[in-house]
Amino acid sequence: MTQAVDIGTIQTLIRLEVPDQVPLTGSIPYDALVKKLKTPVDPELLQRLIRFTRLVGFLDEDAEGAVKHSPMSAIFVNDPDTAGQARFMADFGIRPCSFIYESIKLDPSGEAARQGPLALMAREPGAREGPTFFEVLEKDPVNRKRWHDGMAVHNDSMVRHVAGAYDWGTVQSLVDIGGSEGHVAAVIVNAFPHIQITVQDLPEIIEKARQRGDRHPNIIFEEHDFFTPQPRIADAYFLRLILHDWNDADCTRIVRQISSALRPGARLLIMDAVLPEPGEGSLQSERRLRRSDIGMYTLFSAKERSLAQMRRLVEDCDSRLRFEKLYTPPGSHASMLSWICE
């Protein structure tokens, strides 16, 4: 109950857009604040909510009882990317969790994306299934932008680990599949300037990438749907934070499309979270990874995977793929797994 009240109250203030209407310096009385909100709310009720959330660090009051920012809530004014991620989580990260039980009743496997928690949250009234995560975002440009902005923040905090996650000196040509606008490719090629990298993603993303003025000459961009056959021949193929967005059946399709391009000696590189065995590693680390696993389920009907699950998924797709090693860079939440095609 305690955490539900904490999360639910902060979520409500975010969705009411209260932090957006509080000045970054100074304060604003409750009567004036409610007049700025798009959704009507009684000043006394809003005061009750804020006087609770201030105790957990979200918003605050001055000596006269007017509303002012706390360091946490000020992010919504001075850090748009992080704020977008928080707004996205308020809409999509929390609400689907209340549909987990109903989803299990409809789909005990947890693999059916149209009967997953988010799909049930977004479905038409009375329907037994709903849209997938990506279909929801396709019709919601505001949250689609928040999602991509949030991923940019997330990637910026993790991308520094990529250059040290693998011996890139052994790779001459690399295909970064689902590589977005090339931010990961840039980190690799800046550290290893001999590598030629092809970044593949959907047309909308590739178009944005090509418009950027800071493109490295060793990076080219190519439109590609990873559910279709891989058109490029290369030394290595890289899937970073891709497979955890998809269920086992879809991951099998993705890997098999890459397999069609593999030649002896080529490598498949996957960088994703790897679930530990219970009690393996620190409690904090395991909690973080298992929270991510449940998050993948609620949003995508997907999962984080253990090493055994990842190996089984990949090696069942192509018997030529021999597992080489797993390496987790210090401080990284994701691990690099490598296979060589024999």
Curated annotation (Swiss-Prot):
> What InterPro entries does this protein map onto?
COMT-like, O_MeTrfase_dom, SAM-dependent_MTases_sf, WH-like_DNA-bd_sf, WH_DNA-bd_sf
Any GO BP:
methylation
Catalysed reaction, written as an equation? 6-hydroxytryprostatin B + S-adenosyl-L-methionine = tryprostatin A + S-adenosyl-L-homocysteine + H(+)
Print the keywords alphabetically.
Methyltransferase, S-adenosyl-L-methionine, Transferase, Virulence
Q: Which Pfam families match?
A: Methyltransf_2
Q: Where is the active site?
A: H244
- Pathway as given in its UniProt record: Mycotoxin biosynthesis
What EC identifiers does the entry list? 2.1.1.293
What are the protein's GO molecular function terms? O-methyltransferase activity
* Residue intervals passing through the bilayer: none
Q: What's the domain of life for this entry?
A: Eukaryota
Q: Where does S-adenosyl-L-methionine bind?
A: D201
Q: Is Methyltransferase tagged as a keyword?
A: yes
Role of this protein: 6-hydroxytryprostatin B O-methyltransferase; part of the gene cluster that mediates the biosynthesis of fumitremorgins, indole alkaloids that carry not only intriguing chemical structures, but also interesting biological and pharmacological activities. The biosynthesis of fumitremorgin-type alkaloids begins by condensation of the two amino acids L-tryptophan and L-proline to brevianamide F, catalyzed by the non-ribosomal peptide synthetase ftmA.
Oligomeric and partner information:
Homodimer.
The protein, known as: 6-hydroxytryprostatin B O-methyltransferase
Which organism is this entry from?
Answer: Aspergillus fumigatus (strain ATCC MYA-4609 / CBS 101355 / FGSC A1100 / Af293) (Neosartorya fumigata)
Its gene name is: ftmMT
